[in-house]
Design a protein with these regions (language model features):
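N-terminal catalytic scaffold of extracellular/periplasmic and nuclease hydrolases
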Residues: 27-206, 211, 225, 230
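Soluble metallo-hydrolase cores and metallopeptidase-like ectodomains found primarily
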Residues: 212-216, 220-238
């Protein structure tokens, strides 16, 4: 896919959701669409960045816009409802994952992309089942349904999946599992892409000629940047 240039941390807990859309060579359209999501980021944070650093790359964009991410049932949003607004264009209730206020599934950007034969993927510092990335890959009445979200992801048509959260993909009998059943979702992932669970295999996998890859590098969210030997920038650049 070869697409990511750089993703800089705005604050701890940045989630970087990526939508990859390949276009035919020689036209005037972008080769890919890349969506960077800063946890809790808004206009005030951009302004603070300008005050601290002066001109920022964001200002170089020829077109800019605003998206409201408040929820349908509350002025104060949270990750699930906000990500649903970004992933589907619809407002929903707090805690809902890409379902309407009536709990009907809402079509996501990734689903539209797949209909067009495009490749899609996410690279996150959280668990891949966390509310923000989940809104692009799954549908759930409540963000706490991470075991069900993991199952939807495992049987989805995702091409790249990098982050944490392997504990939701292994049977309950496996030490560290957060599932309550004996489903082995890693096996489902392995049936269609290479899967790695440890940092020591990360470098080789990122440099291999893999068109698809699942790297679940932690049982939950990834360690803090200071506590790991790889960066979000490296992960996204290799996606």
């Amino acid at each position: 896919m070869g697409l990511i240039e750089i993703c800089r941390l705005i604050r701890t807990g940045l989630v970087c959701a990526l939508l990859f859309l390949g276009c035919a060579a020689g036209n005037d359209y972008p080769e890919n669409i890349i969506l960077f999501i800063g946890d809790g980021m808004g206009v005030a944070h951009i302004t603070a960045g300008k005050i601290a650093r002066g001109n920022i790359n964001l200002e170089r964009f020829s077109v800019m816009g605003l998206v409201t991410t408040h929820s349908a049932d509350h002025l104060v949003t949270e990750s699930a409802a906000a990500a649903t607004a970004l992933a589907t264009g619809y407002k929903t209730n707090n805690r809902a994952i890409s379902v309407s206020v009536n709990r009907e599934p809402l079509k996501t950007l990734f689903e539209y992309a797949k209909e067009q034969g495009k490749s899609v993927g996410v690279v996150v510092t959280s668990s891949v089942t966390h509310a923000t990335p989940a809104a692009f890959m799954a549908h759930a009445d409540d963000r706490s349904q991470q075991a069900d979200i993991a199952e939807q992801i495992a049987y989805s048509t995702m091409d790249v999946l990098i982050g944490g959260g392997w504990s939701y993909f292994v049977p309950a009998a496996t030490p560290g599992s957060k599932r309550k059943d004996q489903k082995n979702l890693l096996a489902a992932l392995k049936s269609r892409m290479p899967v790695i669970l440890t940092e020591d295999k990360l470098s080789a996998s990122l440099h291999a000629d893999n068109r698809k890859l699942a790297a679940l590098l932690s049982s939950g969210g990834l360690p803090k940047a200071a506590d790991r030997d790889y960066s979000l920038t490296q992960l996204t650049r290799s996606a």
